[in-house]
Amino acid sequence: MSKQPATNKKPVKAKKKAFQNVPSGIAHVKATFNNTIIAITDPSGRVISWASAGKVNFSGSRKSSAFAATVAAQDAAKTASSLGMKEVEVNLKGPGAGRESAVRGLQSAGLTITAIRDTTPVPHNGCRPRKRRRV
């Protein structure tokens, strides 16, 4: 049995689908105690742009600040508006400090906010919460 000659072919990457013009979408804001993550999707749920406090060069305890959430929201909104997005619905999730400031960041970047929805999951007495912090 002869061996096949070794070929130096790289694996083929799938090309990203170019979004032509997406006029409206949904901004999902997940604000945890340690970070804020913003994902802007089209109405069917495909992610168009995203940003987090860590992506815009905040690290450590500064990631959990309201200012970091504002900068991250502006970063995600600029990318989405360059693809033609004009208006968004906002879904807020989580108890973090960046909830309201992320909404302000989306507005200041030029997106029109049509609705604000709070989709924070509330337990029906599920897992035991973490212990109280004593400073």
Swiss-Prot record:
Alphabetized GO MF terms: rRNA binding; structural constituent of ribosome
This protein's UniProt keywords: Ribonucleoprotein, Ribosomal protein, RNA-binding, rRNA-binding
Instruction: Spell out the Gene3D superfamilies in the cross-references.
Output: Ribosomal protein S11
| Gene Ontology CC terms | ribonucleoprotein complex; ribosome
Concerning InterPro entries, the annotation shows: Ribosomal_uS11, Ribosomal_uS11_bac-type, Ribosomal_uS11_CS, Ribosomal_uS11_sf
Q: Which SUPFAM superfamilies match?
A: Translational machinery components (SSF53137)
- UniProt superkingdom: Bacteria
One Pfam match, given by its short name, reads: Ribosomal_S11
BP term (GO), one: translation
* UniProt record similarity statement: Belongs to the universal ribosomal protein uS11 family.
Q: Which NCBIfam families match?
A: PRK05309.1, uS11_bact
What does the function comment of this entry state? Located on the platform of the 30S subunit, it bridges several disparate RNA helices of the 16S rRNA. Forms part of the Shine-Dalgarno cleft in the 70S ribosome.
Q: What does the subunit comment say?
A: Part of the 30S ribosomal subunit. Interacts with proteins S7 and S18. Binds to IF-3.
Q: Which HAMAP family match?
A: Ribosomal_uS11
- Write the protein's name: Small ribosomal subunit protein uS11
Instruction: Please name the source species.
Output: Protochlamydia amoebophila (strain UWE25)
Taxonomic classification, please?
A: Bacteria, Pseudomonadati, Chlamydiota, Chlamydiia, Parachlamydiales
Which gene does this sequence derive from?
A: rpsK
